[in-house]
């Protein structure tokens, strides 16, 4: 699936991962290794094949970035999604 076919939520999640990887100089491979998740799992998220990644997987990604779930999701983009739901 390409980015044009992703839901807004998926696109924001992928963008957040991409920004953090770039800031930290991580590749997808190193992120998967640090998060102790299969590389294919991460790539399914990045490509949008996984529509709803599990909380445990997202927590492991946050751990790899050495941040809490709150820090990971504390962005203007995620906040706007939450506000749309309310």
Language-model region placement:
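The alpha-helix within a helix-turn-helix
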Residues: 21, 32, 62
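DNA major-groove recognition helix of helix-turn-helix
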Residues: 21, 46, 57, 76
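The DNA-recognition helices of helix-turn-helix-type DNA-binding domains
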Residues: 38, 49, 76-80
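Short, charged recognition helix plus adjacent turn
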Residues: 1-7, 44, 73-86
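A short, Lys/Arg-rich alpha-helix, primarily the initiator
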Residues: 1-27
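Short, basic-rich loop-to-helix N-cap that marks the start of a DNA-contacting helix
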Residues: 49-60
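Short alpha-helical DNA-recognition segment
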Residues: 25-44
């Amino acid at each position: 699936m390409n980015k044009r076919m992703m839901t807004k939520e998926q696109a924001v999640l992928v963008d957040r991962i991409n920004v953090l990887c770039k800031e930290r100089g991580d590749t997808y491979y190193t992120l998967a290794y640090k998060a102790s998740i299969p590389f294919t799992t991460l790539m399914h998220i990045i490509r949008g094949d996984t529509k709803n990644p599990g909380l445990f997987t997202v927590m492991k990604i946050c751990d790899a970035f050495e941040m809490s779930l709150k820090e990971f999701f504390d962005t203007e983009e995620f906040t706007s999604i939450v506000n749309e739901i309310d």
